[in-house]
Amino acid sequence: MSGRDVAGSAVRRPSTLAAKARRPNLASAPRMQQSTNAQHRGRLPARIRISALGINRRLVPLSVLDDGSLEAPDRYADVGWWRHGPLPGSPGNAVVVGHVDSKTGPAVFYGLASLQRGDRVEVTRRNASPALFWVRRVERFPVKDFPADRVYRHGGPSGLVLITCGGKYDRAAGRYLDNVVVFASPVPHRSGLASK
């Protein structure tokens, strides 16, 4: 996601977009889980740590905009989580987003595409033990081919999905053409990954 425009993958900044930026609604985030998350308030995510990138940030809750897209954090240093989606450690994918850059330089998820298989991601939860994940794969998708069904998955195995913008920046449209998507799975308790 860019500070200029974080459009396309259903992840874009809700305000201060360039007037000429196109705002396609290509991958809507489902409006679900509100009551479930309220019931599990003690397990809500509080911080994310990605040691490989030197990230240790508070998580801010994000909502779905009127056009169906997931809003982006207001500040370029913030990391946000989809508050109406699955919680980290629960069935389905918890979705976390951050900006790749701003008009003044790199932002919090600038290095996201450099993550390697096996890198660890830790999500601290309120009143619960941390949810630990390991990176399975890093993929890049054109905005028009964003895999919404894979990303915004409810049910099934627990997962964590990290998203930012990537690829070439289209100055005329005011947005990046691709999204970087990191898919991560829970760290097995007896795995050597737990200490990585």
Where are these regions (language model features)?
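Solvent-exposed, non-transmembrane regions of membrane-associated and secreted proteins
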Residues: S2-R117, E122-K196
